[in-house]
């Protein structure tokens, strides 16, 4: 039998699901964080997006997966880093925030992940592993908070006459606190 297939872009599904499920009106700012993609998008309508930032190396989800692997926390990385972070102290390790002060909304997480790998070689206990997981997650949060503030400014500059009513976070890593 002949079957009818519809091509649906996975990322477009993430981008549009908030407007479908929650009756969110356009335009809105979207942070898409998944294993393969980390992007700031201004969503102006169906099939009408402008990417204003992306990761220049590892996607956020990829960094979580690799950190979970380095710390032997199991897969999938996002939920496990989250779970073990709750057992740790989030400011026990000072970790780098690459390109945090560079203009624009691009993200870089490779240097952060490399530092986690370097520090993981000297861990003496599970407690220290959980502390490093918590510090990693907290550092990612700080990076995303700073870059989101930049993205919000860019949104306001671009969409004049409309206030930023909605900031949406979508993708697998959106579940992390």
Locations of regions flagged by a protein language model:
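A cross-family phosphate/adenosyl-ligand binding-site feature
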Residues: 5, 30, 75, 94
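Glycine-rich phosphate-binding loop plus the immediately following alpha-helix
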Residues: 9, 22, 44-89, 113-124
């Amino acid at each position: 039998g002949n079957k009818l297939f519809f091509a649906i872009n996975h990322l477009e599904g993430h981008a549009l699901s908030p407007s479908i499920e929650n009756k969110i009106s356009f335009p809105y700012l979207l942070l898409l964080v998944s294993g393969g993609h980390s992007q700031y998008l201004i969503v102006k309508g169906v099939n009408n997006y402008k990417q204003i930032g992306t990761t220049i190396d590892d996607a956020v989800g990829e960094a979580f997966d690799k950190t979970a692997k380095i710390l032997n926390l199991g897969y999938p990385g996002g939920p496990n880093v989250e779970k073990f972070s709750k057992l740790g102290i989030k400011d026990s390790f000072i970790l780098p925030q690459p390109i945090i002060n560079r203009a624009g909304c691009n993200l870089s997480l490779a240097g952060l992940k490399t530092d986690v790998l370097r520090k993981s070689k000297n861990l003496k206990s599970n407690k220290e592993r959980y502390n490093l997981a918590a510090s990693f997650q907290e550092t990612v949060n700080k990076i995303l908070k700073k870059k989101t503030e930049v993205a919000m400014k860019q949104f306001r500059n671009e969409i004049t006459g409309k206030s930023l009513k909605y900031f949406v976070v979508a993708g697998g890593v959106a579940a992390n606190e």
